[in-house]
Amino acid sequence: MTNIRKNHPLLKTINDAFIDLPTPSNISTWWNFGSLLGACLIIQVLTGLFLAMHYTSDTMTAFTSVTHICRDVNHGWMIRYLHANGASLFFVCLYAHIGRGIYYGSYLYSETWNIGVLLLLTTMATAFLGYVLPWGQMSFWGATVITNLLSALPYIGTDLVEWIWGGFSVDKATLTRFFAFHFIMPFIIMALAMVHLLFLHETGSNNPLGLISNADKIPFHPYYTMKDLAGLVLLILTLLTLTLLFPDMLGDPDNYTPANPLNTPPHIKPEWYFLFAYAILRSIPNKLGGVIALIMSILILALLPLLHTSKQRSLMFRPLSQCLFWLLVADLITLTWIGGQPVEHPYIIIGQMASTLYFTIFLVLMPIAGLIENHMLKL
């Protein structure tokens, strides 16, 4: 009798993706983050679903409905903080996943990579929409400032902003549509993730050496299912530690004050995982220039396959490019710190230098380093 998992139409798909999938035998822990992102997405959808059962998207009751969830709903506080801190861990895994893709040259699978960039943009949009929903001070002013950036677009800007707001300011219509979009977008993310996996399984996984590994592959199960399970245990442990011991560590105290259009907070800033992009936005004095820099800070990832000049795929044997990669990591940490600081000296100039360095590494230094390393191979 033939094995049902290899012949049943539905089970065959699952088998080919998660059980008998031929996987390089040498992929490291950095390859765990894909499955961890899937776990984060499931956690976010489930906790979000239970929150949506009690949340009301009305400016008069949104803030009190979140308070009601925390005080009166069974384990509501836990669901709320699992959702909020789950978003932070989602972005930790996302940035680690992208970092691994850059370090080991995974971006040369351009279809998989471009779907990944699209996934990043969709996830960032979803997180921004979700941050507005509790309708605290930072929610309201964050929504006002970020949506207002679209007014920098020539000719259509003002009309576009009012169309998104559903009026002449951020109000009930804005909150309702943000809730609707925040609810639907995780399902779009799920669909995109499936396309991401589809393209990945067309080519097979990359590996730390950046070499073709067809001669040395092992089945995904049990080897990598166990490895992913170990990563999942650590992820859940971290999430529970954050949620149960330090629930507000990554949040903003201003969001415990109900939204007040008449009182602007002294420092408007987004969640920590957007601070690097916010710092790049603020580092350019011109409004339209800032918006373009903000968008390009993410879209520059889509250019990586075109900017690859090295004869080697991975950075494993490229010391010059390795130095630039870790310089980029340090630069992103600096930008994240600057994004949370007030707009004053010396933070302005540090932000401008860090923003310039960010784009220079991607557009100039990395391609040049690749060419130098090619030349060094001939010596």
From Swiss-Prot:
Heme b b566 binds at H97, H196. Keywords: Electron transport, Heme, Iron, Membrane, Metal-binding, Mitochondrion, Mitochondrion inner membrane, Respiratory chain, Transmembrane, Transmembrane helix, Transport, Ubiquinone. The keyword Transferase does not apply. InterPro entries: Cyt_b/b6_C, Cyt_b/b6_C_sf, Cyt_b/b6_N, Cytb/b6-like_sf, Cytochrome_b, Cytochrome_b_C_euk/bac, Cytochrome_b_N_euk/bac, Di-haem_cyt_TM. A ubiquinone binds at H201. Its cofactor is heme b. Heme b b562 binds at H83, H182. PROSITE patterns: CYTB_CTER, CYTB_NTER. Binds 2 heme b groups non-covalently. The chain crosses the membrane at residues 33-53, 77-98, 113-133, 178-198, 226-246, 288-308, 320-340, 347-367. The keyword Cell membrane does not apply. Component of the ubiquinol-cytochrome c reductase complex (complex III or cytochrome b-c1 complex) that is part of the mitochondrial respiratory chain. The b-c1 complex mediates electron transfer from ubiquinol to cytochrome c. Contributes to the generation of a proton gradient across the mitochondrial membrane that is then used for ATP synthesis. It is a multi-pass membrane protein. Heme 1 (or BL or b562) is low-potential and absorbs at about 562 nm, and heme 2 (or BH or b566) is high-potential and absorbs at about 566 nm. GO terms for cellular component: mitochondrial inner membrane; respiratory chain complex III. Belongs to the cytochrome b family. Gene3D superfamilies: Cytochrome Bc1 Complex, Chain C. GO terms for biological process: mitochondrial electron transport, ubiquinol to cytochrome c. Its main location: mitochondrion. It is found in: Mitochondrion inner membrane. GO terms for molecular function: metal ion binding; ubiquinol-cytochrome-c reductase activity. The cytochrome bc1 complex contains 11 subunits: 3 respiratory subunits (MT-CYB, CYC1 and UQCRFS1), 2 core proteins (UQCRC1 and UQCRC2) and 6 low-molecular weight proteins (UQCRH/QCR6, UQCRB/QCR7, UQCRQ/QCR8, UQCR10/QCR9, UQCR11/QCR10 and a cleavage product of UQCRFS1). This cytochrome bc1 complex then forms a dimer. It comes from the Eukaryota. This is Cytochrome b.
